[in-house]
UniProtKB/Swiss-Prot annotation:
Modification Phosphoserine, positions: 392, 394
Protein's cellular compartments: Cytoplasm; Nucleus
Biased composition regions of type Acidic residues, renumbered to the chain: 429-444
Gene3D superfamilies given in the database record: Winged helix-like DNA-binding domain superfamily/Winged helix DNA-binding domain
Name of protein: DNA-directed RNA polymerase III subunit RPC3
List of residues that carry Phosphothreonine: 27
One Gene Ontology cellular component annotation held by this UniProt entry: RNA polymerase III complex
KW tRNA-binding (keyword) present: no
Entry function: DNA-dependent RNA polymerase catalyzes the transcription of DNA into RNA using the four ribonucleoside triphosphates as substrates. Specific core component of RNA polymerase III which synthesizes small RNAs, such as 5S rRNA and tRNAs.
Assembly and interaction partners: Component of the RNA polymerase III (Pol III) complex consisting of 17 subunits.
Length: 654
């Protein structure tokens, strides 16, 4: 696989140096001097990525990333021409730092004249690692299985923080500063755990290679390998080349995740260790799987209750590491623009979810991992309310005076005494209850019994939301390909309802369910006043949640001769919502940095070594109040950013 990737990186492109079309649309001056409001309408990605990189690497790195996001791939010479105040050396130095943190990818191309040029692309994966850096550390510490909680968690946090800040590192380099043998053994075992859990993977050329170019190289290679005198038609040749390219592409993509490439056995201790010279980096996809699980757990809480959601949480955590990727690399190649390819990709994804080993589970598997404090007894109804009503009705009927019975000779049989009839009735009711609840009594002894867990799994499988699918009796799996669109729709409706009101969500659902509707149909189905419907529709159109489609009645295209219908296009709506959330996150970061700049003198004074811990003595009352205000506003920014991030990532997931 290294040979394949090496060929892709050194492949000669005979097409020459191509010009970037987007360069005509946005000039460098526009990019560098653009205001926050204009950035929202032009490119929210540009605004967010520049603010993130500026906060971590400074102004120069932000300028380089801004150019790459706005104009696409650029060479060093082109970057120098477009960025004022930076020469070749400063651009190269900045690119080295960005490449080290995986914020930039590169590819070398050779023109017809033989001149080699290296082009640089921005890499959103590295930028997202900077965005999630604190959450990555917190998530890994939570998931790690360690003996000494405090000490080992601190070591794990230091390891992950070093990997994020350096981009990648080797175990040999990390242990070079450790003197104690016992500490070296502990750190080495923690590295093994991080690799086994999938949070650390081997860094390779793949992390610096553009996916689109890699796919294009593999496809052209296999297409050219087919003999020209082959009797196959051009369509079959392309289909065959595509299949072979997919096979090689999957092998290259999955290679960094293979533990055999990372772990080995120490001959001295016979224990598994990480190869000392292997460079390790953060596996963002593994972390995002955990974020996806949290989103699904929160959705389950709102739909099936908190107890069933806790059972669902164990099921997700059990299969999380082997679950499908958040975004399949094939979706980034442009291959799915073909409708047939998109459909076959969807079918294949559903098959993989069902057939992949480690993704199916049953109640016994979950019982081994349920926490001791979770008691499932009493979490399910033992009898339907309708049964009680029927029983009370029958008892009431029995209490009514019955018809008198006579013998042949006319003797009237007297009724039983009240005490005797009541005793017989109570004994009958007790017997019925014992028969109905006989099976449930066995479950009350074990809080984690398989039957109770299976009942909760059936609730998840029978829900309107496809939380689980049952392949065979008692065996389940999580259908991510069907569940993620439902999650997106649910979160989108929540945002619409919380910002525009419940009436907007009602209209949005009405239009989505009816596909393409007129205002007359909306008036008859939405059960709202006509004035309210029009004002709400205007808000939905402004937020790109609803679109207007003109349908001409005749050949005359004048407005008076046309009918205007409404429809919802989910792709456009989700994309607009994602960009809106992106801009709001970037705006929060922008305000935070601006706040620090305005109070830079006070912050420098408060951060001095001789002032720390003695602020009340050495700072004026006005300075203390100002410092308190700065800290409170910064905490407020982080809280709002966390909420926006949890919404934004839903629309980022494929």
């Amino acid at each position: 696989m290294d040979e394949l990737l090496g060929e892709a990186l050194s492949a000669e492109n005979q097409a020459g140096e191509s010009t970037v079309e987007s360069e005509k649309l946005v000039t460098p001056e526009d990019v560098m001097t653009i205001s926050s409001l204009e950035q929202r309408t032009l490119n929210p990605d540009l605004f967010l990525y520049k603010e993130l990189v500026k906060a971590h690497l400074g102004e120069r790195a932000a300028s380089v990333i801004g150019m790459l996001v706005a104009l696409g791939r650029l060479s060093v010479r082109e970057l120098v021409e477009k960025i004022d105040g930076m020469d070749v050396d400063s651009v190269k130095t900045t690119l080295v730092s960005l490449t080290q943190l995986r914020c930039v990818k590169y590819l070398q191309e050779t023109a017809i004249s033989g001149k080699k040029t290296t082009y640089y692309y921005y890499n959103e994966e590295g930028i997202h690692i900077l965005l999630y850096s604190g959450l990555i550390i917190d998530e890994i510490i939570t998931q790690m299985r360690v003996n000494d909680e405090e000490e080992h968690k601190q070591l794990v946090a230091e390891i992950v923080q070093n990997v994020i800040s350096l981009g990648s590192l080797t175990v040999e380099d990390y242990l070079s500063s450790v003197t104690s043998d016992s500490m070296k053994y502990t750190i080495s075992s923690l590295f093994v755990q991080l690799c086994e859990m999938g949070y650390l993977i081997q860094i390779s050329k793949l992390h610096y290679t553009p996916i689109e170019d890699l796919w294009q190289f593999l496809y052209e290679k296999h297409y050219k390998n087919i003999p020209r005198n082959s009797p196959l038609s051009d369509l079959k040749k392309r289909s065959q080349a595509k299949m072979n390219a997919k096979t090689d592409f999957a092998k290259i993509i999955n290679k960094p995740n293979e533990l055999s490439q990372i772990l080995t056995v120490d001959p001295k201790t016979s224990l598994r260790i990480v190869k000392p010279t292997v460079s390790l980096t953060i596996n963002l996809d593994r972390f995002m799987k955990g974020r996806r699980s949290k989103q699904l757990i929160n959705l389950a809480k709102t739909r099936v209750g908190s107890v069933t959601a806790q059972v669902y949480k164990i099921a997700l955590r059990l299969t999380e590491q082997k679950s499908p990727k958040i975004r399949d690399p094939l979706t980034q190649t442009g291959l799915l623009q073909d409708l047939e390819e998109a459909k076959s990709f969807q079918d294949e994804a559903e098959l993989v979810e069902e057939k992949t080993p480690g993704l199916t589970f049953n109640a016994i598997d979950l019982a081994r991992h349920l926490p001791a404090e979770l008691d499932l007894r009493g979490s399910l109804l033992s009898r339907k309310p309708s049964d009680n009503k029927k029983r009370s009705g029958s008892n009431a009927a029995a209490s009514l005076p019955s018809k008198k019975l006579k013998t042949e000779d006319g003797f009237v049989i007297p009724a039983l005494p009240a005490a005797v009839s009541k005793s017989l009735q109570e004994s009958g009711d007790t017997q019925e209850e014992d028969e109905e609840e006989e099976d449930l009594d066995a479950d009350t002894e074990d809080p984690h019994s398989a039957s109770l867990i299976n009942s909760h799994l059936k609730i998840l499988a029978s829900s309107n939301f496809p939380f689980l699918n049952e392949t065979k009796p008692g065996v389940y799996y999580v259908p991510y390909s069907k569940l993620m669109p439902v999650l997106k729709s649910s979160v989108y409706e929540y945002v619409i309802a919380s910002t525009l009101g419940p009436s907007a969500m009602r209209l949005s659902r009405c239009i989505r369910d009816n596909k393409l509707v007129s205002e007359k149909i909306i008036n008859s189905t939405a059960l709202m006043k006509e004035k309210d419907i029009r004002s709400t529709l205007a808000s939905l159109i402004r937020y790109n949640s609803v679109e207007i489609q003109e349908v001409p009645r005749t050949a005359d295209r004048s407005a008076s001769r046309a009918v205007f219908l409404f429809r919802c296009k989910e792709t456009h709506s989700y994309n607009f919502m994602r960009q809106n959330l992106e801009w709001n996150m970037a705006n929060l970061l922008f305000k935070k940095e601006k706040l620090k700049q305005e109070n830079s003198t006070l912050l420098k004074k408060a951060n001095r070594d001789d002032v720390k811990g003695r602020e009340n003595e050495l700072l004026l009352p006005s300075e203390l109040n100002q410092l308190k205000m700065v800290n409170e506003r910064e905490l407020n920014v982080f809280a709002r950013l966390s909420r926006l991030l949890s919404l934004w990532e839903v629309f980022q997931m494929a």
